[in-house]
């Protein structure tokens, strides 16, 4: 009986995680942090983070860049309202928030989320001016044989430049003049018969900066593409995650 009860509780917990609880807020965290300072765990070579809502630890595995939490197509169901979020270096491995050593908190911010809504929290910038950028995800299921997509420009530069995004299958730009720390609305596009290539261009030109090759969207899925990197330090790239 005890084993069955345990399994039942796990199933209920998984259902709450996968399906939205209208009493909670839904959050996805995306790490685009480009600096390798402050240093993380010894010998790791990259800076990774554990995240806390108030004093509650959220992720079991440290989050590196580029990366998202929780898993694909999933949001974390969290307490709504105003909360303090702290992102601590992975050299702190305990579950308890406790007393924080000086320099261990790389990101900190007070975030307000409403019950029943979906959000993405981007970890952006470079040390020592990194910050948290919260965006509401207004998710509407696309029609059959269509998908939805949006774009975010999160490349760090001393002289940020706007970008355009060009779809080779659509043969047109599907995002225009996107400035730093800006996210477009979702756009619904017809499902391509073959894979697409998305080119990031200097705004107003046809000069390709970098591309995302072999994008194969799925019918009725919702995607976010974001640029990341730091001019002159970390290679600039375009990558994506699935909202739903």
Language-model-detected regions and their locations in the chain:
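Intrinsically disordered, low-complexity polar regions and short flexible loop motifs
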Residues: 6-244
């Amino acid at each position: 009986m005890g084993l069955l009860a345990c399994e039942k509780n796990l199933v209920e917990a998984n259902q709450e995680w996968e399906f939205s609880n209208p009493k909670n807020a839904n959050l996805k965290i995306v790490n685009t942090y480009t600096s390798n300072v402050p240093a993380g765990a010894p010998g790791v070579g990259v800076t990774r983070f554990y995240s806390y809502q108030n004093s509650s630890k959220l992720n079991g595995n440290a989050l590196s860049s580029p990366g998202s939490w929780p898993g694909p197509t999933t949001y974390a169901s969290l307490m709504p309202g105003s909360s303090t979020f702290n992102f601590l270096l992975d050299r702190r491995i305990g579950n308890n928030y406790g007393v924080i050593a000086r320099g261990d908190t790389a990101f900190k911010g007070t975030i307000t989320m409403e019950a029943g809504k979906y959000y993405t929290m981007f970890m952006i910038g470079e040390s020592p001016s990194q910050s948290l950028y919260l965006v509401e995800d207004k998710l509407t299921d696309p029609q059959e044989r269509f998908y939805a997509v949006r774009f975010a420009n999160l490349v760090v530069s001393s002289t940020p430049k706007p970008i355009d995004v060009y779809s080779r299958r659509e043969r047109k730009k599907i995002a225009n003049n996107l400035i730093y720390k800006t996210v477009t609305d979702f756009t619904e596009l017809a499902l391509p018969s073959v894979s697409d290539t998305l080119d990031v261009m200097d705004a107003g030109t046809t000069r390709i900066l970098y591309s995302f090759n072999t994008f194969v969207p799925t019918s009725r899925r919702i995607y976010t593409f974001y640029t990341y990197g730091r001019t002159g330090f970390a290679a600039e790239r375009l990558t994506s995650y699935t909202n739903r």
